[in-house]
A protein has these predicted regions:
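Post-transcriptional modification and biogenesis factors for structured RNAs
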Residues: 1-135
Length: 135
């Protein structure tokens, strides 16, 4: 599913639907009232959250989904497959400080020297792939 904060573009805008070849209609979307606050709902349901931010001390390839508690200081249930939500911000400003703080982990994508950022879609694709192969 995709959780959208109030500042996100409309995923059902005509051009979005067209460039996604209609696949946007197959992905569940949720409109959050307040992203930092609504992340607690994910945590309450056992879903850990990883904020992608270039300033994170940990690199994405170092994140072990099985070692992430659903909330900071929480316990880890090793009997279940880890459930992780990747949290990304807008291109340019990135995530807000309150959103980064609300996440249970922070990670950065390692990039070549001189590259300071990635397109949000590219960053998310890399993160989802990395977490999938890490399982």
């Amino acid at each position: 599913a995709v959780i959208l904060d109030p500042g996100c573009a409309d995923p059902f805008y005509r051009r979005s639907v067209r460039v996604s070849l209609g696949h946007v209609m197959a992905v569940p979307t949720i409109h959050a009232a307040s992203l930092p606050g609504d992340l607690a709902v994910l945590h309450d349901h056992g879903i850990a959250t990883v904020a992608l931010t270039p300033s994170a001390p940990q690199r994405l390839h170092e994140v072990d989904p099985a070692a992430l508690p659903a909330r900071a200081g929480g316990s880890i249930d090793s009997s279940q497959r880890p459930r992780v939500a990747i949290v990304v911000g807008a291109e340019g400003p990135g995530l807000t400080a309150p959103t980064i703080t609300a996440c249970t982990a922070r990670a950065a994508i390692e990039m070549a020297a001189g590259v300071d950022s990635l397109n949000v879609a590219t960053a998310l694709a890399i993160a989802l792939h990395q977490l999938q192969i890490g399982r």
